[in-house]
């Protein structure tokens, strides 16, 4: 049997020599190489699932980091704000008390005004002194009211801590931590008002009045019991 005879199984096992048109096709591919096959397209659900997981991970990361940072910021900033807030409140309370005191306080009556049967000249003189005191008291009240209005504006939390945004350094720098910068900035503003209002003088007077108030309360309680 000749070797070049066609075998019925050549189409299956490929033992027959290549056909002429197949040889020409391979030569054409060698002369013009084909680009590598592209990656198979992903199923349509994968991009959507990937975006969902990226978004969920991003939100979880923000929530975890936010909780840690907020708690740390609260622990460091709350004592500073509470201390400065109490000092600023003391300044405003003193000024507000003075304004109300001058507003509701009547003129001081002289003994001559309380006596009957005084001459017309004495009554006129006493009335003139009362008018002068009322005018002086009114001017003093207006002066304190202007000072109080200015203090309310300058002791506002945004005004006290203005100018420190973005000036925070790294956590390792002890001298430039945010709470230290806030304390320094706020202390300078509040201290100037404490000196202007003489807070120390008022606190001494309040400390002196506290024992009297306690004694009066005790006496009142004893009288009610009896």
Curated annotation (Swiss-Prot):
Task: Using the UniProt annotation, give all residue ranges assigned to the region (deca-GX3 motif).
Answer: 57-97
Q: What InterPro entries does its record include?
A: Essential_protein_Yae1_N (IPR019191), Yae1-like (IPR038881)
**Signal peptide (UniProt feature, chain positions):** none
Q: Which UniProt keywords apply?
A: Cytoplasm, Nucleus
> Is the keyword Nucleotide-binding assigned to this protein?
no
Span list, region Disordered: 1-53, 105-136
Q: Name one GO biological process term.
A: protein maturation
Return the GO cellular component terms, semicolon-separated.
cytoplasm; nucleus
Ranges of biased composition (kind: Basic and acidic residues): 18-31
Q: What does this protein do?
A: The complex LTO1:YAE1 may function as a target specific adapter that probably recruits apo-RPLI1 to the cytosolic iron-sulfur protein assembly (CIA) complex machinery. May be required for biogenesis of the large ribosomal subunit and initiation of translation.
Which family, according to UniProt? Belongs to the YAE1 family.
Subunit structure, per the record?
May form a complex with LTO1.
What protein name applies here? Protein yae1
